[in-house]
Swiss-Prot record:
Protein name, entry field: Zinc-finger homeodomain protein 14
Coiled coil: 76-103
InterPro entries: Homeodomain-like_sf, Homeodomain_ZF_HD, ZF_HD_homeobox_Cys/His_dimer
Molecular function per GO: DNA binding; protein homodimerization activity; transcription cis-regulatory region binding; zinc ion binding
Zinc fingers (ZF-HD dimerization-type), renumbered ranges: 7-51
Region ranges (Disordered): 82-112
Location of the DNA-binding region in this protein: 106-168
Annotated GO CC locations: nucleus
Ranges of Acidic residues composition bias in the record: 86-98
Source lineage: Eukaryota, Viridiplantae, Streptophyta, Embryophyta, Tracheophyta
Annotated localization: Nucleus
Domain of life according to the entry: Eukaryota
Self-association state and partner proteins as the record states: Homo- and heterodimer with other ZFHD proteins. Interacts with ZHD11.
Protein backbone atom coordinates (compact mmCIF):
# COMPACT_ATOMS: atom_id res chain seq x y z
CA UNK A 1 0.00 0.00 0.00
CA UNK A 2 1.42 3.35 -1.05
CA UNK A 3 0.54 6.71 0.53
CA UNK A 4 0.95 10.15 -1.03
CA UNK A 5 -0.68 13.51 -0.49
CA UNK A 6 -2.06 16.07 -2.90
CA UNK A 7 -2.74 19.73 -2.14
CA UNK A 8 -5.85 21.26 -3.70
CA UNK A 9 -7.51 24.69 -3.51
CA UNK A 10 -6.29 27.48 -1.24
CA UNK A 11 -8.45 27.88 1.88
CA UNK A 12 -6.81 31.07 3.21
CA UNK A 13 -9.31 33.71 4.31
CA UNK A 14 -7.88 37.01 3.10
CA UNK A 15 -10.63 39.07 4.75
CA UNK A 16 -10.42 37.57 8.26
CA UNK A 17 -9.20 40.84 9.80
CA UNK A 18 -12.30 42.57 8.43
CA UNK A 19 -14.58 39.93 9.92
CA UNK A 20 -15.58 38.62 6.51
CA UNK A 21 -14.66 35.72 4.24
CA UNK A 22 -12.79 35.97 0.94
CA UNK A 23 -10.55 33.44 -0.80
CA UNK A 24 -8.17 34.13 -3.67
CA UNK A 25 -9.49 31.53 -6.12
CA UNK A 26 -6.33 29.44 -6.38
CA UNK A 27 -7.64 26.02 -7.47
CA UNK A 28 -4.56 23.87 -6.86
CA UNK A 29 -1.22 24.14 -5.10
CA UNK A 30 1.61 24.73 -7.59
CA UNK A 31 4.81 23.17 -6.25
CA UNK A 32 7.75 25.62 -6.35
CA UNK A 33 11.30 24.47 -6.99
CA UNK A 34 12.30 25.53 -3.45
CA UNK A 35 10.27 26.38 -0.35
CA UNK A 36 6.62 25.80 0.50
CA UNK A 37 4.93 28.88 -0.99
CA UNK A 38 2.46 28.27 -3.82
CA UNK A 39 3.63 29.68 -7.13
CA UNK A 40 0.06 30.62 -8.14
CA UNK A 41 -1.18 32.48 -5.05
CA UNK A 42 1.87 32.97 -2.83
CA UNK A 43 0.28 31.30 0.21
CA UNK A 44 2.04 28.66 2.30
CA UNK A 45 1.27 25.03 1.49
CA UNK A 46 -0.54 24.61 4.82
CA UNK A 47 -3.35 26.93 3.59
CA UNK A 48 -4.17 24.50 0.79
CA UNK A 49 -6.61 21.62 1.36
CA UNK A 50 -4.60 18.42 1.82
CA UNK A 51 -5.84 15.10 0.48
CA UNK A 52 -4.09 11.91 1.58
CA UNK A 53 -4.21 9.36 -1.21
CA UNK A 54 -3.70 5.72 -0.28
CA UNK A 55 -3.55 3.53 -3.33
CA UNK A 56 -4.47 -0.11 -2.86
CA UNK A 57 -4.03 -2.46 -5.81
CA UNK A 58 -5.67 -5.48 -4.13
CA UNK A 59 -9.31 -4.33 -4.52
CA UNK A 60 -10.94 -5.86 -7.57
CA UNK A 61 -14.11 -3.89 -8.34
CA UNK A 62 -15.52 -6.53 -10.67
CA UNK A 63 -16.18 -8.97 -7.83
CA UNK A 64 -18.64 -6.56 -6.12
CA UNK A 65 -22.13 -6.36 -7.60
CA UNK A 66 -23.38 -2.75 -7.74
CA UNK A 67 -26.80 -3.00 -6.14
CA UNK A 68 -27.33 0.68 -5.44
CA UNK A 69 -25.74 4.10 -5.53
CA UNK A 70 -25.19 3.80 -1.77
CA UNK A 71 -23.17 0.63 -2.32
CA UNK A 72 -21.07 2.29 -5.05
CA UNK A 73 -20.25 5.16 -2.69
CA UNK A 74 -19.29 2.68 0.04
CA UNK A 75 -16.94 0.94 -2.36
CA UNK A 76 -15.38 4.25 -3.38
CA UNK A 77 -14.75 5.12 0.28
CA UNK A 78 -13.46 1.61 0.88
CA UNK A 79 -10.78 2.07 -1.79
CA UNK A 80 -9.03 4.77 0.27
CA UNK A 81 -9.20 3.13 3.72
CA UNK A 82 -6.52 1.19 5.53
CA UNK A 83 -6.57 -2.60 5.36
CA UNK A 84 -7.92 -2.93 8.92
CA UNK A 85 -10.72 -0.40 8.33
CA UNK A 86 -11.51 -2.09 5.02
CA UNK A 87 -11.91 -5.53 6.64
CA UNK A 88 -14.24 -4.14 9.32
CA UNK A 89 -16.40 -2.36 6.74
CA UNK A 90 -16.57 -5.40 4.44
CA UNK A 91 -17.87 -7.50 7.36
CA UNK A 92 -20.56 -4.90 8.07
CA UNK A 93 -21.49 -4.63 4.38
CA UNK A 94 -22.16 -8.35 3.94
CA UNK A 95 -24.87 -8.15 6.60
CA UNK A 96 -26.46 -5.03 5.04
CA UNK A 97 -26.62 -6.05 1.38
CA UNK A 98 -29.54 -8.45 1.74
CA UNK A 99 -31.68 -5.95 3.66
CA UNK A 100 -30.43 -3.01 1.58
CA UNK A 101 -32.30 -4.20 -1.50
CA UNK A 102 -35.54 -4.54 0.50
CA UNK A 103 -35.36 -1.10 2.10
CA UNK A 104 -36.71 1.97 0.37
CA UNK A 105 -35.52 5.46 1.12
CA UNK A 106 -38.07 7.33 3.19
CA UNK A 107 -38.17 11.09 2.84
CA UNK A 108 -38.97 13.37 5.73
CA UNK A 109 -42.69 14.09 5.76
CA UNK A 110 -43.54 17.73 5.11
CA UNK A 111 -46.02 19.30 7.52
CA UNK A 112 -49.26 20.33 5.89
CA UNK A 113 -51.64 22.70 7.61
CA UNK A 114 -55.31 23.33 6.88
CA UNK A 115 -56.48 26.80 5.93
CA UNK A 116 -58.04 27.21 9.39
CA UNK A 117 -54.77 26.24 11.10
CA UNK A 118 -52.79 28.69 8.94
CA UNK A 119 -55.24 31.52 9.65
CA UNK A 120 -55.23 30.79 13.40
CA UNK A 121 -51.40 30.64 13.46
CA UNK A 122 -51.19 33.89 11.49
CA UNK A 123 -53.52 35.72 13.91
CA UNK A 124 -51.78 34.35 17.00
CA UNK A 125 -48.30 35.07 15.61
CA UNK A 126 -49.36 38.66 14.91
CA UNK A 127 -50.54 38.90 18.53
CA UNK A 128 -47.12 37.65 19.70
CA UNK A 129 -45.26 40.08 17.43
CA UNK A 130 -44.03 37.32 15.06
CA UNK A 131 -41.45 36.03 17.52
CA UNK A 132 -41.42 33.37 20.21
CA UNK A 133 -38.21 34.58 21.83
CA UNK A 134 -38.54 35.98 25.36
CA UNK A 135 -42.05 34.51 25.63
CA UNK A 136 -41.33 32.15 28.54
CA UNK A 137 -44.19 33.67 30.51
CA UNK A 138 -46.56 32.75 27.67
CA UNK A 139 -45.18 29.23 27.20
CA UNK A 140 -48.25 27.57 28.72
CA UNK A 141 -50.60 29.79 26.71
CA UNK A 142 -48.73 28.91 23.50
CA UNK A 143 -48.92 25.20 24.37
CA UNK A 144 -52.70 25.46 24.93
CA UNK A 145 -53.11 27.34 21.63
CA UNK A 146 -51.12 24.70 19.73
CA UNK A 147 -53.14 21.86 21.26
CA UNK A 148 -56.33 23.73 20.38
CA UNK A 149 -55.54 23.89 16.66
CA UNK A 150 -53.82 20.49 16.52
CA UNK A 151 -50.17 21.37 15.85
CA UNK A 152 -47.06 20.93 17.95
CA UNK A 153 -45.24 23.89 19.46
CA UNK A 154 -42.21 23.00 17.33
CA UNK A 155 -44.24 23.13 14.10
CA UNK A 156 -45.86 26.41 15.17
CA UNK A 157 -42.46 27.93 15.96
CA UNK A 158 -41.07 26.77 12.60
CA UNK A 159 -44.14 28.09 10.76
CA UNK A 160 -43.76 31.50 12.45
CA UNK A 161 -40.06 31.70 11.53
CA UNK A 162 -40.73 30.67 7.93
CA UNK A 163 -43.71 32.99 7.39
CA UNK A 164 -42.95 36.17 9.31
CA UNK A 165 -41.33 37.75 6.26
CA UNK A 166 -44.58 37.33 4.30
CA UNK A 167 -47.07 38.57 6.90
CA UNK A 168 -45.11 40.88 9.23
Amino acid sequence: MQSTCVYRECMRNHAAKLGSYAIDGCREYSQPSTGDLCVACGCHRSYHRRIDVISSPQINHTRFPFTSLRRVKQLARLKWKTAEERNEEEEDDTEETSTEEKMTVQRRRKSKFTAEQREAMKDYAAKLGWTLKDKRALREEIRVFCEGIGVTRYHFKTWVNNNKKFYH
